[in-house]
Structure formats: structure tokens, C-alpha cells
Amino acid sequence: MARTTVRLTFRGDARNDPIIYRLGQDYKVVTNIRRADVGNDTGWVELDLDGEPAEVDRALEYCRSRSIGVDKLEHP
């Protein structure tokens, strides 16, 4: 199992959707929130995703399909 750290950026209605819940329920990934900041109009979360690389890619593609910005980060 590999770990991928990402920053997800939310705008508008997307910040009210249960995206992190959906990732854990619909994809074979384990999520861990490292940091987050959510305001009235925008928000972001740094998130670890543990899982097989193909499943992590599927989860991130789901985020992109919801107009959520996805940036892969280097491990600290």
C-alpha cells in the first residue's frame, strides 16, 4: 500500500459536499487529514491517501470530476 499526500482545493458548493467521506466509502483508500482551512467561499485540505496507486488515482479523478483542485505534495 502506498501513501499519496495531496492538497484538495474547494470552491463554491463543492466545499459543502462530503468529499472525504466519499473517498473512504467509494474507493479503497484510507484518508488522514493533515491540515485544513475552510472559509465561506473556498477551502483546502492536505490529505494523506493510503491505498493501491490505481485506486488512489481513481479517487483523485473523482475529485477532479467534482471541480476540486488536486495537487500532489511531497511527503514531509
Model-derived features: positions:
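Long, contiguous binding/interaction regions
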Residues: 1-76
